[in-house]
Amino acid sequence: MAVQSYAAPPTPWSRDLAEPEIAPTAYVHSFSNLIGDVRIKDYVHIAPGTSIRADEGTPFHIGSRTNIQDGVVIHGLQQGRVIGDDGQEYSVWIGDNVSITHMALIHGPAYIGDGCFIGFRSTVFNARVGAGCVVMMHVLIQDVEIPPGKYVPSGMVITTQQQADRLPNVEESDIHFAQHVVGINEALLSGYQCAENIACIAPIRNELQRQEDPPTLHVEMLTGEKNTMTTDYGTHVRQLLQQGYQISLEYADARRYRTSSWQSGPTLTGQQESQVMAAIAQLLKEHEGEYVRLIGVDPKAKRRVFEEIIQRPGQAAVASSSSSRPSATVNASPVGSLDAAVVAQVRQLLQQGYQIGTEHADARRYRTSSWTSCAPIQSKQEPEVLAALEACLQEHAGEYVRLIGIDQKQKRRVLEQIIQRPQGPVAIAPKTPTPVATSHASVSSGGNDTLLSADLVNQIQDLLRQGCQVITEYADQRRFRTSSWQSGIKITSAQQINDLRSFLAEHQRDYIRLVGVNPQAKQRVLETIIHRPNGKAASNGNSTRGQGFTPRPTASSQGSPSTHSLSQEVIEQVRQLLQQGYTLGLEHVDARRYRTNSWQSGPRIEAKNLNEALAAIQACLQEYSGEYVRLIGINPAGKQRVAEILLQQAAK
């Protein structure tokens, strides 16, 4: 199940866009909410409905084998830190083997020691709870330090240190109760992980199905019947048996086959080749019209060494000449409506040992790059992967679907390619899989595509080559005047520049700017407007090649706003005000009020560079056409005006 985790939003106190760090063995339910610098260690269980937000106080630490139950809220203040067991500062530290139960509130600065139990609806704020404490239900702990091994009865309000020091010690029965709750949640953790593992859940489903529908046995003599196994498969069975491997079978109907949900068949324990072949022939006959595959298992290493489909609906057993070792390729024709380029891309990924995954998003989520993971494709066989891929495209018709190539050893993505849009499938050219942090794929920007200029495409590629993160932001005309930008899509590889074209098409009436972020320095290195409501994209000639992390927009490039109504003197004054650190504002007045000097405050211009300031001024001049408009320069330190410049006079 996909984990819903987000980077911390940019705020006045934090602009590092930190994201959660989740250990591979931890289980985080998709209905939980993780934001910011949250560090989750091994075997942590986070239940649905929890909210862990490190967007103000940061970072958070959640120790190994800790369970966070439904409805828990963990948050922190901008100021205030605690010292964790590793000697570092944290907004919230939760130790190992801690149980935080339903509806509890942990608000930093807060420290919860190892082995603690926090009861239902209890609150810990600006406090330290020592190791081994048992806090019961509806308790408030604030501004105190609870010594280790203390028991806090239900309903108590602990707000003074004298109250904390007088608390009784934990008794044996309290420890047993806390251990009982922890044990239950560890069992839940194992159960949730098993439910997402086909190999674990399949035998349980098969057992339930056998209990509900007892099979009717039909024993028939095989003598005189034509054996459905081919000579090639007889060779494979013989080789597997000679090497000491076990042979088993799996089967699936057409619906389960599309989701790679195979059902386990019998394990053939006999060592006689004739007995094994007879058993396989019997199973093929029983499951006629279904998919059946042959499995070779190494009993010592407890892993599969061979997988091959030997029967398909409407076909006889499939011959194969592959050897008895894990196989990543099967020559097959394209499945259904899949584009030949998609099939070639999948084949290339499988040949290199990568795992295939898919993600989908509707038009609204696509604009914010909020992709949802589809059912995992565990198979390494090309026909099975293509069938599952086609089923995913059919299931999510009318949505965006992208193909993911995953390097399981390095635990990183090597390919992200959109293969379907709401209008239909996408024609793609096969690309060599590379880590998504790099970009050497060529992207066309000329010809019939007028949304992106060649300079802009080159600039994006330069930023990616330098290791920068590339994101987009957009704003309508009203928000643009106040510089209130909203987050758009994130571009992690040159292959996603097509996504940028779609994003520009969807926001034709908005301002869109491109942002380059240095992830190491955690600062923005580029902000440039690439699209305006008139539909024109900026022709960005400011390439970052050879400049390290120092690209900066200039007033003469990057799509600078039209300044035909502003004199060069005014532009120079605006530049000087910005360079001196002054803030800009506007005031407007009609002709009648102008005579009495009764100016009305306009929007405040929170621009970070000359481009944005001039664009915002132009937008205001258009909005207040026919009125007097003047620019105000304000010294934020002294809170006084340093300049008043008349920009526009009322029409007479």
Curated annotation (Swiss-Prot):
Record bears the keyword Electron transport: no
Listed EC numbers: 4.2.1.1
EC class (word): lyase
Region entry RbcS-like repeat 2, CcmMS2, spans: 338-422
Region (Disordered): 530-566
Alphabetized GO MF terms: carbonate dehydratase activity; structural constituent of carboxysome shell; zinc ion binding
Residue ranges, annotated region (RbcS-like repeat 1, CcmMS1): 233-313
One biological process term in Gene Ontology: carbon fixation
Regulation: Carbonic anhydrase (CA) activity is probably under redox control to remain inactive in the cytoplasm. CA activity of full-length protein inhibited by ethoxyzolamide, and for both full-length and CcmM 1-209 construct by reducing agents.
Ranges for region Has carbonic anhydrase (CA) activity: 1-209
Domain of life: Bacteria
Major location (coarse): other
Cofactor, how bound (note): Binds 3 zinc per trimer.
GO CC aspect terms: carboxysome
Region (RbcS-like repeat 4, CcmMS4): 565-649
Active site: 56 (proton donor/acceptor)
Ranges for region Does not have CA activity: 1-193
Binding, Zn(2+): 75, 102, 107
UniProt keyword list: Bacterial microcompartment, Carbon dioxide fixation, Carboxysome, Disulfide bond, Lyase, Metal-binding, Photosynthesis, Repeat, Zinc
Disulfide bond positions: 194-200
Subunit structure: The N-terminal structure crystallizes as a homotrimer; zinc is bound between adjacent monomers. The C-terminal RbcS-like domains bind to holo-RuBisCO. Full length protein interacts with CcmN.
Family: Belongs to the gamma-class carbonic anhydrase family.
General function of this protein: Functions as a scaffold protein for the assembly of beta-carboxysomes, initiates carboxysome assembly by coalescing RuBisCO (ribulose bisphosphate carboxylase, rbcL-rbcS). Produced as a full-length and a shorter form; both forms are required for correct carboxysome assembly and growth. A carbonic anhydrase, catalyzes the reversible hydration of carbon dioxide. Essential to photosynthetic carbon dioxide fixation, supplies CO(2) to ribulose bisphosphate carboxylase (RuBisCO) in the carboxysome. Active when the disulfide bond (194-200) is oxidized, suggesting the interior of the carboxysome is oxidizing.
Entry note about domains: The N-terminus (residues 1-164) forms a trimer with a partially blocked channel forms at the trimer interface. The C-terminus has 4 domains that resemble the small subunit of RuBisCO (rbcS) joined by flexible linkers; the first one (CcmMS1) has been crystallized and folds much like RbcS. CcmMS1 binds to holo-RuBisCO (RbcL(8)-RbcS(8)), a CcmMS1-CcmMS2 constructs binds about 10-fold better, while the entire C-terminus with all 4 CcmMS domains binds with an intermediate affinity. CcmMS1 binds to a different region of RbcL than does RbcS, up to 5 CcmMS1 domains can bind to the intact holo enzyme.
Protein name: Carboxysome assembly protein CcmM
Provenance organism: Thermosynechococcus vestitus (strain NIES-2133 / IAM M-273 / BP-1)
Primary gene name: ccmM
